[in-house]
Amino acid sequence: KPPNVWRGSPAEDLCDLDDIVEPVVFYTGAAREAARDYAKNANVAATVALAGLGFEKTEVELCADPSISSNVHDVTVEGAAGTFRFEIAARPFPDNPKTSMLAAFSIVRALANRTTALVV
């Protein structure tokens, strides 16, 4: 994510967000700590952990990247059958750049799914 969205998080103590000129990985570890310490920024990591191996076995890297304007999530799944990788580059929500516009759409879909017989 862009450096400005990490303001108000522990990332401010780990790197100088104002002077970053190239991507800086400031957290590498389990999804549990990422979700706890970066609650406003690591919801995709938490979602992947819930859908996959759990919070302890899901590995997370958090990065401040001054070259991007989107909230980018790079997900890699490795297993005996092979490797699967995909990237989400979502535009930040105008009122809260720490989250993406996709988050609002996900909430709308979740509410719609509660009122329909067919869930997509």
Question: In which residue ranges do the predicted regions lie?
Answer:
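Active-site-lining helix/loop region of Rossmann-like oxidoreductase modules
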Residues: 1-120
